[in-house]
């Protein structure tokens, strides 16, 4: 398995442990018929040094309405699931560390969005 696919598999697996029933996870862009609550993640390779691939993992969590408790709880769960997490698979070792968590203001005021970014270090095994 290539390293990017292996990393994406790890990310989807971790998100799957915290996403509520009926919520979806997308890579790069959500589908038009997405559910009310969903997450979109992206991976950007930012460095390669001595066999260590450094990625920035960005996870955007979306909800709709005026009550922010659901999206804040989900962002808390994602942060807990990823921060300082070590995942070892047959192909890669992956380490996650939180960099930033912030609210993103959307033009549509009924949209609620939280962005979490993680420094992600991948080693091929």
Give the positions of each predicted feature:
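Charged, amphipathic alpha-helical segments and their flanking helix caps
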Residues: 1-23, 42-125
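A short, hydrophobic beta-strand-centered structural micro-motif
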Residues: 34-43
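Short acidic low-complexity segments
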Residues: 25-33
């Amino acid at each position: 398995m290539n390293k990017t696919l292996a990393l994406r598999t790890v990310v989807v697996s971790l998100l799957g442990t915290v996403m509520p029933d009926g919520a979806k996870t997308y890579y790069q862009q959500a589908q038009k018929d997405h559910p009310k609550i969903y997450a979109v993640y992206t991976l950007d390779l930012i460095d390669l040094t001595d066999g260590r691939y450094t990625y920035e993992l960005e996870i955007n969590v979306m909800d709709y309405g005026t009550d922010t408790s659901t999206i804040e709880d989900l962002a808390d769960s994602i942060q807990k699931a990823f921060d300082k997490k070590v995942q070892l698979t047959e192909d890669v070792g992956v380490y996650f560390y939180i960099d930033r968590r912030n609210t993103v203001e959307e033009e549509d005021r009924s949209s609620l969005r939280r962005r979490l970014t993680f420094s992600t270090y991948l080693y091929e095994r």
